[in-house]
Amino acid sequence: QRQMCIRDSYTGRTLFGAMPPKGQELDDHYFGTIRQRIAAFMRDVNIELWKVGVSSKTQHNEVAPAQHELAPIYAEANIAVDHNQIVMQTLKRIACEHGMKCLLHEKPFAGVNGSGKHDNWSITTDDGINMLDPGTTPHENIQFLLVLTCILKAVNKHADLLRESAADPGNDHRLGANEAPPAIISVFLGEQLEDVIDQLISTGEATHSLEGGKLETGVRTLPELTKDATDRNRTSPFAFTGNKFEFRMVGSRDSIASANIVLNTIVAEAFAEACEVLEKADDFQLAVHDLIKEYAMENQRIIFNGDGYSEAWVKEAERRGLPNIKSMVEAIPAMVTEKAVTLFERFGVFTKAELESRAEIQYESYAKAINIEARTMIDMARKQFIPAVIKYTKTLADTVLAVKEAGVDASVQAETLEEITVCLLYTSDAA
């Protein structure tokens, strides 16, 4: 039984507590079946979501005890944002009906994994063509390579802004740990696409694409399994996964609107700059080839296929000049830089005044959230813990007297009483 002190209506996370003897180390919850009570809750959630047009599709256990995941079917960005808000409201409401509490805080319990969102983002034309579909021969797909390198340029140029879009007080407890992507923005492409980019940079031309091949299981009785040419790399904050990018930094309580506004706008800028070059070109094929190579070379530093959790990557990112923005307070200024203001005003997304207003609101929200947590901790300590400790000191004092009267050494009890009394004095001075 987990025993922690929590006031969800105040902070959404535990402020004091102790780890139970067993946490998530056995992975038995992650790989286990959904418990009947949770399955009943999820069934009702699905029904309520389907009623209002949210296509909830899958649900499964996650790593931490009592942690679960839900995934809807893809939709256009503005609709998906609304759907996500409805999902969060529905989860909370249905949980109460089942006698449970749905915690959407990014780190509700210390010592076990927190929660986040995976924002699966792609670009599709009005006639249904996915611009991020590499096809079977990515090295020959000029349209895909141009779109890909434009995205690399956008993410490299505006990494600070993309990091800011996922800034949240709760995310400060989660990002960079071995459960979530690091606070350093990088792009994972997978072996196949990274090889194509390397060919473009080293030789000026991509002539082939790596194939996935077959996965050798070592068991003769099993059929051969097709091996994908790429991978998911869950340590990456912005990973290419087949025909889309997966932005994994968004906090579990946050709206996905900010992340998608930033992604759409920075990529629109990269597209616009590419258009300015290509529309003036006399030889379009030569110009697009040179532009793809130029963008690949200029933005290669943002590509990283390795372990984002490792300390080696932090040092490598610093060597590459990539920003490592560790907290929300450090991230907010990115919203009001001259670069950001120019970007958003150019495309009519936000004015300078609107950006400054949003930055001010975020500063205020952060300060209030931290202040509420601090005041709640003080309130809990004064009204719950200190009275309980004082009561315990009386019990210890009575025990010391009783043991001494029995003619037995009471030094252990006396020493414990003295230590607790000293702690109480420090607490009194701090108050």
Q: Language-model features: where?
A:
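Acidic, glycine-enriched catalytic cores built around paired aspartates
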Residues: F41, E48-K51, I94, F109, ...
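Residues forming anionic-ligand binding surfaces in small-molecule and nucleic-acid pockets
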Residues: Y10-H29, H60-L70, M249
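Conserved oxyanion/phosphate-binding beta-strand-loop segments in alpha/beta enzyme cores
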Residues: R7-L15, M42-V63
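A short glycine-rich, hydrophobically flanked beta-strand micro-motif that places a catalytic Asp/Glu
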Residues: T58-Q59, K101-F109
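Accessory "access/gating" subregions that flank catalytic or transport cores
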Residues: Q24-V54, L70-A75, K92-C96, M100
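Helical (often loop-to-helix) elements that flank the catalytic cores of nucleotide-handling enzymes
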Residues: T11-R13, I79-C96, I123-V155, A257-V262, ...
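Conserved small/polar residues in nucleotide/adenosyl-binding loops
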Residues: R2-D8, Y426-A430
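Beta-rich nucleic-acid/ligand-interaction surfaces
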Residues: Q1, P65-E69, H105-S122, N171-L175
